[in-house]
UniProtKB/Swiss-Prot annotation:
GO terms for cellular component: cytosol. Pfam families: MGS. Keywords: Lyase. The keyword Nucleus does not apply. SUPFAM superfamilies: Methylglyoxal synthase-like. Catalyzes the formation of methylglyoxal from dihydroxyacetone phosphate. It catalyses: dihydroxyacetone phosphate = methylglyoxal + phosphate. This is Methylglyoxal synthase. It comes from Oceanobacillus iheyensis (strain DSM 14371 / CIP 107618 / JCM 11309 / KCTC 3954 / HTE831).
Length: 140
């Protein structure tokens, strides 16, 4: 599965701790992240991560493009709800795209724990089955 990892500045340490704890699960998937978050996770865990621009420079929109193209399966986004973000419209657009395209999105560590356990159990295998069927039928 393709999984995006995003964290606002005040939540980056939480993301590093989370990805360190679940490296054994995340290492089985293709990981994508916004710039600084991806670098910090990779340095801390050794996970291979495709890094986009930082969020304020368009990284959220790059991940959004993957969602719109059917190339993203899950978003783990540790948001900081107590700090105003200069790129908040991009964050809202990303969340909207997840809703439109039925992409699981979690915005805090409690929800991420549920997602990661579901991922390790195979609860999201249905996404891969649908993708394979669409590829055979040639439908988007």
């Amino acid at each position: 599965m393709n999984i995006a990892l995003i964290a606002h500045d005040e939540k980056k340490e939480d993301m590093i701790q989370f990805t360190t704890a679940y490296t054994h699960v995340l290492s089985k998937h293709r990981l994508f992240a916004t710039g600084t978050t991806g670098m910090k996770i990779s340095n801390a865990t050794g996970l291979q991560i495709h890094r986009f621009q930082s969020g304020p420079l368009g990284g959220d929109q790059q991940i959004g493009a993957m969602i719109a193209n059917g190339e993203m399966d899950m978003i783990i986004f540790f948001r900081d709800p107590l700090t105003a973000q200069p790129h908040e419209p991009d964050v809202s657009a990303l969340m909207r795209l997840c809703d439109v395209h039925q992409i699981p999105l979690v915005t805090n560590i409690a929800g991420a724990e549920i997602f990661i356990h579901g991922l390790s159990r195979g609860d999201l295998k249905w996404r891969e089955i649908i993708k394979e069927r669409q590829e055979k039928e040639g439908t988007p």
